[in-house]
Amino acid sequence: MTELSAADPAFVQAADALAKTYDPAGTESRWQCAWEESGVFHPDPQAAGEPFSVVIPPPNVTGSLHMGHAFNTALIDTIVRFQRLQGKNVLCLPGTDHASIAVQTILEKQLKAEAISRYDLGREAFLERAWAWKEESGGRIVDQLRRLGYSVDWQRQRFTLDEGLSAAVREAFVRLHEQGLIYRGEYLVNWCPASGSAVSDLEVEMKEVDGHLWHLRYPLTGGPAADGTTHLEVATTRPETMLGDVAVAVNPADERYRHLVGQTLILPLLGREIPVIADDHVDQDFGTGCVKVTPAHDPNDFAIGRRHDLPQITVMNKNGSMNGHAGRFEGLDRFEARKAVVAALQEEGLLVKVEPHRHSVPYSDRGKVPVEPLLSTQWFVRMEPLAARCHECLDHGAPRFVPNRWQKVYRDWLTEIRDWCISRQLWWGHRIPAWFVVSETDDQLTDATPYLVARSEEEAWQQARDQFGEAVVIQQDEDVLDTWFSSGLWPFSTMGWPDQESADLECWYPTSTLVTGFDIIFFWVARMTMMAGAFTGRMPFADVYIHGLVRDEQNRKMSKSAGNGIDPLLLIERYGTDALRFALVREVAGAGQDIRLDYDRKSDTSATVEAARNFANKLWNATRFALMNLGGETPASLGEPDPASLQLADRWILSRLARMNRDVVERYDSYRLGEAAKCLYEFAWNDICDWYLELSKRRLHPGEDASGEVLADQCTARQVLAKVLADLLVMLHPLMPHLSEELWHGLTGAPKDTFLALQSWPASNKSFLDDALELSFTELIEAIRVVRNLRAVAGLKPAQTVPVQFITGRPELAALLEQATADITALTRAESVVVATSADLTQRCLAGVSGELQVLLPIDGLVDLDALRGRLEKDLAKAEKEIAGLAGRLANPNFAIKAPPNVVEECQSNLAEAEAQAELARQRLSDLG
């Protein structure tokens, strides 16, 4: 091999293999197209390799992706790309969710702006409009997912209303009904007046509000009791519901009211007689110990009513207005009725007092209005039998939660589970596969109307004819299923279930890992485990990796309402996808931990993501440097270095590489992705770019020997540099896929139809591991760093050479420094390097210390001492001024109490740093005498 000169065409070609500067947009677009067109991520279920599968949490087709989606994507794609490099047959399956309530809410707002309702439009036309909106919005979301560099199989993309998934939903409903696990009944449900639909407990958000507690007087029927009691006093936060009261309850052990149990009261405003009952649910020590009972409008009262066989009087319509049972308040909106009821009670002398009261109010997560507990006939799933199977699996460690603390949260929810209301009074969604058998002349539905559950209308017709004869009319239930019903089938419905012969299902189910946020453990994770247990007999995933939230620089949760959300595409446009992905993953301190992402809204910039972009630039420049110094060779053509020819720096970087490989694999395998990113960053930036590249420069340009052959040491340096960079790019690929693919192709000269994404993880050569060498080399690095710092203090020009003295009493450290004299000379611009056991104090020197090493930099005749002394005094004065300000701030009691903890910590850190700077300046001044 011969060295290339700058004029050599091969040299020019090598230098031009990568552009001078990194263009993220062009690079990312090019590789995204290449991957997709080549089917790189479209696996064959018959292919070799251990199956590994992930189904992505399907984003709702309701707009644009947010930073939480970007974070989830970065984590999932890091995992699946790593597993693909491990030789596994990886399926990452994408898709979107129809988001029933969310989409219908958006569409009804659009219709309202057009002064029409969905009923004016009709169901068929409304659904046509919904599908058109889905195509537009869903297509936008898919494009955004592509921009994030997701290595998913787009050919297997699914949508929860696809025909295949719809068939799976109908099959699941029928089977659960056949098993007696789905039933229809009248129960108290959470009703959202805004969307006109029932919502599940999990779709209700509790909000703390400042309200009132109204104390009301309920007179005894027929006048005072024997002890003179004339009335009972109750308190409520919802006085409009008292119109539906059917009793007042007291605790049976409460001596104050025991004699009144069985007597009756007059319901204020309506004049109905209601009984005084005894129930253990009542807390006699809370308030007056008397509780109004409204079974049709309160879950606890509903239970009391069931126990005492009380009537259920609904006083509210489904639109939130009062109905005929509300008497003179009929037609009023519920909140207007509240005011009117309070005014009427006050007028009749039945309002005792009003107290301010802060309490939790249930809000519809989608409708954004307070929900009303209302009696309604709905479809329910019996959850206890489904949860029992999950409990059994969890006892055997399935699924495994990472971090483990979320297992308890999951188990507790399974234990405290209630039946799930799955019907929604909407049009967009999976229509419930149930048909009512009605009269040809009367299609009004009642609770007594018989119904049939079937997989299709034809099957329902057949059932109807078999049961009722030929002359029947069937009418499908108008309601749709809760979105989470179909989402609960996602891991296996997307792979072909209920077709048990599906190749995808056989190969990749159960899936390997679910990556999701803690906020949907109940909404989604538990529903999937219960559905999977019921229909496949196995848990749907081996591991559940729970990640935290993305918070802003003030540690606030990002949300639309807070106005602190960040559009990931803005940061991608500015810094590139890989920079954003790397920044998000690197910020993860531990599994399940929230991350912070700074963002300047005025300039649409982020220092965190910019740092990741700078890292990408660093890698780009390092690879270009290698290409210009490998003599037109590739890692493959250069081959492995001969261990006998390795220099100190070579052995050090190869030991670091072997350790990094081992550590990164262990961290990827254990979902410590943030740690893996930090390890690779430190290795690439510090070990390779800051040190090995600098140390290798003199060896990469040694000139030629008499025979014209490249010196053996130059060849070794090339081999090591090529190997280290090639392995690094593979290890970085899961985190920065586009950049690593581009650089890997440039470095290896691989054909365009060969992809880093499908390569094998580099083998770790454990024979290179050398703990003692790494420790020694760290001492060498620190010695060089001290010399550089002393040069900076002295104000020496970059080209100015000075002698350097190292003083140490440790023979092994002295030997290391002697061995590395050439490297020290090159990296510190040393005129000479002397290693001794005692100092030569005949000259004035600047001194530095690193462990057991003293470093002396003679400055007599080389530095303007007066100017240096002036700079040091100025530095000292600046540091002392900063110390005074920070110390005073910390001494202020108000600051310590009122300032956020992170601000106090930052102030303390700055004070410690200023004190260290002041002490260093004093030491330097002392050295000058």
Curated annotation (Swiss-Prot):
Record the organism.
Prochlorococcus marinus (strain MIT 9313)
What does the UniProt entry state concerning the protein's domains?
ValRS has two distinct active sites: one for aminoacylation and one for editing. The misactivated threonine is translocated from the active site to the editing site. The C-terminal coiled-coil domain is crucial for aminoacylation activity.
Q: Which reaction does it catalyse?
A: tRNA(Val) + L-valine + ATP = L-valyl-tRNA(Val) + AMP + diphosphate
Q: Does the keyword Aminoacyl-tRNA synthetase apply?
A: yes
Similarity comment text for this entry? Belongs to the class-I aminoacyl-tRNA synthetase family. ValS type 1 subfamily.
Q: Locate the motif 'KMSKS' region.
A: 557-561
* Identification of the protein by name: Valine--tRNA ligase
Share what the entry says about its subunit structure, partners included. Answer: Monomer.
Report the EC number(s), separated by commas if there are several.
6.1.1.9
Which PANTHER family did the record assign?
A: VALINE--TRNA LIGASE, CHLOROPLASTIC_MITOCHONDRIAL 2, VALYL-TRNA SYNTHETASES
Extract the CDD domains matched here.
Answer: Anticodon_Ia_Val (cd07962), ValRS_core (cd00817)
Cellular compartments annotated = Cytoplasm
Question: Which HAMAP family has this protein been placed in?
Answer: Val_tRNA_synth_type1
Give GO terms for biological process.
valyl-tRNA aminoacylation
Where on this chain is 'HIGH' region (motif)?
Answer: 59-69
User: What is this organism's lineage?
Assistant: Bacteria, Bacillati, Cyanobacteriota, Cyanophyceae, Synechococcales
Q: Which residues bind ATP?
A: K560
InterPro entries to which the protein is assigned, alphabetical: aa-tRNA-synth_I_CS, aa-tRNA-synth_Ia, Anticodon_Ia_Val, M/V/L/I-tRNA-synth_anticd-bd, Rossmann-like_a/b/a_fold, tRNA-bd_arm, tRNAsynth_Ia_anticodon-bd, Val-tRNA_synth_C_sf
Free-text function comment from the UniProt entry? Catalyzes the attachment of valine to tRNA(Val). As ValRS can inadvertently accommodate and process structurally similar amino acids such as threonine, to avoid such errors, it has a 'posttransfer' editing activity that hydrolyzes mischarged Thr-tRNA(Val) in a tRNA-dependent manner.
Assigned keywords, A-Z: Aminoacyl-tRNA synthetase, ATP-binding, Coiled coil, Cytoplasm, Ligase, Nucleotide-binding, Protein biosynthesis
Q: Which GO terms describe its cellular component?
A: cytosol
- A Pfam entry, by short name: tRNA-synt_1
Q: Coiled-coil intervals in this record?
A: 862-929
The record lists its disulfide bonds as none
Gene Ontology MF term list: aminoacyl-tRNA deacylase activity; ATP binding; valine-tRNA ligase activity
Principal subcellular localization:
cytoplasm
